[in-house]
């Protein structure tokens, strides 16, 4: 039987600093999504979540609202409260789904084209995508897809994910299945 907590731990917390990397801010984008079973004001929920996540990224903000397949979105550079004054937030309307994004750019440039969520029209419908992180093979994947005739509107790796989902959607019965297949 252990006599103290120290007997149970491989290292005491004070010893961990010797083996862990130095602590420093490692920001990434902030992403939020909400689903409501009935049509309601989902945009303000996304707004407040993005406001809380704003420390994650302060280059730009965007919200897309889905009301039974009809998308309303706004995206721009700036802080959340600058991008979404009350009237603009109201203009997003109501819906059952909202996705929001605040950007901390790690790939692509910091221009308006790269503001997320990305809105995509494809053969089987429409989607809004917000992504946090980096694809480790984004450069090679973009080159491969462009050599096959793909055209991209942004310089972010997030658009590669949207493209992969749209391609899988051609073969899959549902968007959920397409997402799973695209991310394998």
Question: Which residue stretches match the model-derived regions?
Answer:
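Conserved short alpha-helical segments that host acidic/polar catalytic motifs at enzyme active sites
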Residues: 2-184
């Amino acid at each position: 039987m252990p006599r103290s907590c120290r007997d149970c731990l491989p290292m005491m917390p004070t010893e961990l600093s010797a083996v862990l990397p130095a602590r420093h801010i490692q920001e990434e984008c902030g992403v939020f999504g909400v689903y409501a079973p009935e049509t309601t004001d989902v945009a303000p929920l996304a707004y407040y979540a993005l406001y809380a996540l704003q420390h994650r990224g302060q280059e730009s903000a965007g919200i897309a609202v889905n009301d039974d397949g009809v998308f309303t979105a706004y995206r721009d550079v700036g802080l959340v409260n600058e991008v979404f004054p009350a009237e603009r937030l109201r203009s997003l309307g109501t819906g059952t789904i909202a996705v929001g994004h605040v950007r901390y750019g790690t790939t692509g440039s910091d221009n308006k084209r790269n503001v997320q969520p990305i809105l995509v029209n494809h053969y089987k419908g429409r989607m809004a995508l917000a992504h946090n992180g980096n694809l480790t093979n984004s450069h090679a994947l973009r080159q491969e897809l462009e050599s096959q005739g793909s055209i991209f509107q942004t310089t972010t790796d997030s658009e590669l994910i949207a493209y992969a989902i749209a391609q899988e959607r051609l073969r899959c019965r549902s968007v959920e299945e397409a997402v799973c297949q695209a991310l394998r």
